[in-house]
Amino acid sequence: MADSGNPNENNPSTDTGVNDAVSTSHGDASASYDASAITVLEGLDAVRKRPGMYIGSTGERGLHHLVQEVVDNSVDEALAGHADTIDVTILPDGGVRVVDNGRGIPVGIVPSEGKPAVEVVLTVLHAGGKFGGGGYAVSGGLHGVGVSVVNALSTRVAVEVKTDGYRWTQEYKLGVPTASLARHEATEETGTTVTFWADGDIFETTDYSFETLSRRFQEMAFLNKGLKINLTDERESAKATAGADEAGEDEKHEVKSVSYHYEGGIVDFVTYLNSRKGELVHPTVIDLEAEDKDKSLSLEVAMQWNGGYTEGVYSFANIIHTHEGGTHEEGFRAALTSLINKYARDKKLLREKDDNLTGDDIREGLTAIISVKLAEPQFEGQTKTKLGNTEVKTFVQKVVYEHLTDWLDRNPNEAADIIRKGIQAAHARVAARKARDLTRRKGLLESASLPGKLSDCQSNDPTKCEIFIVEGDSAGGSAKSGRNPQYQAILPIRGKILNVEKARIDRILQNQEIQAMISAFGTGVHEDFDIEKLRYHKIILMADADVDGQHINTLLLTFLFRFMRPLVESGHVYLSRPPLYKIKWGRDDFEYAYSDRERDALIEMGRQAGKRIREDSVQRFKGLGEMNAEELRITTMDQEHRVLGQVTLDDAAQADDLFSVLMGEDVEARRAFIQRNAKDVRFLDI
């Protein structure tokens, strides 16, 4: 979540970021990986001047992208069958060390450069084993580009390679070698260690998020069967967290670490995602693998239906999450829809007069992982995360149809349960359509007939308009008085909306508060959703800064994630951050604090400046309704001063899992989540 604006401080601008770029090569994975396999395309000069072109941003996302680039190289070694363990360590001084047990970056001289291959890989853009075709058959990330970019954007890089019977080292400063490659003692071990320190003059922050890295590494471990990825945080802050809930002194010196290793690969991934979904429709995960060696194309699919109402199909190409789908997803969906309908009719589960099940009916409650690996992927779409290779659709459709036909024939009882669930979804869809038709006739879902309680803005330019979703009439009244009516709309809602995690679409559309939001946004919902019709480019959830307020926000986010996900993916959803305290030094001298820590810091700074504070000088806001219109305007609504958190979606599978835990039926999973994360909560307002 990215913050912008603050009445008390200047924050860095919102980090927009872009998705990882991807490059791969064709060739025989068993081909030699030596200096001759390294090819050079262009120089590295521009990277420090325009880092955003290479890593997307210089904010948090770009910083974590550096780690990803180095780890991608190690994963390439695993994909080629030469590595099975990757160790990532966040060092006490903020550096990051990545170690793998692969073959080691070659140290021989690259003929065209007259330098050791490892130095070329680290100092020349687009120099890497994938481009010439001799090093990797399939690879993900930006191998070659990534490591040299990491070098260019770091104050210091140290590389250690074990290869050709020796240990070799070299160091770099601001992308330039400080000395020649040095050969050390003989060793039979192989592998590469890259340690780097991101440049604080380039990045807005050099503080890595353990959670962000661990989520991505867990996903990578799921997608690379048998690969072990260890993440360790040696920073003092992590040590303090690790021992914060322990009585003994020794525990305070523990480091924070996680290890991910899945022999079942994506089968374990599906099991993990479905473990929070409640009852399963069938006990075993359906899995299949296939390969077309002539086309350097392979496929893995794992899938299982649960008793929930939402679809969770996630696709990957060369381990890169294809957020926008593509030909592999199209092939999967086409095979699934045609086969399930054919099977249902052959087994008389669908009668002659019944309509075919739609793809949405069939995929209700389905959790599936589709992972393809190919030599030359073509990426399309707005964020270059949509696979475009036409040959992939044909391959996936044929393989899924054949394997799933066999599974259905061998498991007739489970097959019948799957189809019955699809039929129930179809009945709900028909009921929802009738409900939509009825509400459309009444004008309840149409933006042409806006909800009566909406205080709309005057502008018709969606890019400038924003809507505040405010809980409670009193807060809604203050918000109406404090808004800029030219660009700011207010929609008050009453109480907590329906928990959509536990309801089908037909029931959801009957909820008045949800009807009001759908109508106000103008996009439609679910299968009728059209983001081009969005009336406000900022949707701001404004709730009290207490537990009830956070619960309301979670309910709203669950609805938006499940039924209007493109709003979240496109960065249109924000959380307001109203202050918790008002500190009054005098009649016209006051400051706002957004946490207990900030309150204490402001009071201490005031005392040091000689300011006097009375006992009644610190006002605690228990709700938005306690603020007058002017206070709400200054702290929460004024675009120049407010603090907003942008809701971003870097990992849909992880977000899906989190919403299932927080809002689903599994009470034990929710309790375990709270216990596991309680030590990370510094200020709990109950």
UniProtKB/Swiss-Prot annotation:
Cleaved signal peptide residues: none
Compositional bias segments (type: Polar residues): 1-27
Cofactor: Mg(2+); Mn(2+); Ca(2+)
InterPro entries in alphabetical order: DNA_gyrase_B_C, GyrB, HATPase_C_sf, Ribosomal_Su5_D2-typ_SF, Ribsml_uS5_D2-typ_fold_subgr, Topo_IIA, Topo_IIA-like_dom_sf, Topo_IIA_B
Localisation per UniProt entry: Cytoplasm
GO molecular function annotation: ATP binding; DNA binding; DNA negative supercoiling activity; metal ion binding
Keywords annotated in UniProt: ATP-binding, Cytoplasm, DNA-binding, Isomerase, Magnesium, Metal-binding, Nucleotide-binding, Topoisomerase
Enzyme Commission code: 5.6.2.2
Site (Interaction with DNA): 496, 499
The name this protein goes by in its record: DNA gyrase subunit B
Pfam family, one: HATPase_c
Note: Few gyrases are as efficient as E.coli at forming negative supercoils. Not all organisms have 2 type II topoisomerases; in organisms with a single type II topoisomerase this enzyme also has to decatenate newly replicated chromosomes.
Amino acids binding Mg(2+) 2: 544, 546
Cofactor: binding comment: Binds two Mg(2+) per subunit. The magnesium ions form salt bridges with both the protein and the DNA. Can also accept other divalent metal cations, such as Mn(2+) or Ca(2+).
Subunit relationships: Heterotetramer, composed of two GyrA and two GyrB chains. In the heterotetramer, GyrA contains the active site tyrosine that forms a transient covalent intermediate with DNA, while GyrB binds cofactors and catalyzes ATP hydrolysis.
Catalyzed chemical reaction(s): ATP-dependent breakage, passage and rejoining of double-stranded DNA
Family of the protein in this entry: Belongs to the type II topoisomerase GyrB family.
Sequence ranges assigned to domain Toprim in this UniProt record: 465-579
One GO BP annotation of this record: DNA topological change
Binding site for Mg(2+) 1: 471, 544
Location of region: Disordered: 1-29
Gene designation: gyrB
The protein's role, per its UniProt record: A type II topoisomerase that negatively supercoils closed circular double-stranded (ds) DNA in an ATP-dependent manner to modulate DNA topology and maintain chromosomes in an underwound state. Negative supercoiling favors strand separation, and DNA replication, transcription, recombination and repair, all of which involve strand separation. Also able to catalyze the interconversion of other topological isomers of dsDNA rings, including catenanes and knotted rings. Type II topoisomerases break and join 2 DNA strands simultaneously in an ATP-dependent manner.
Gene Ontology terms: cellular component: chromosome; cytoplasm
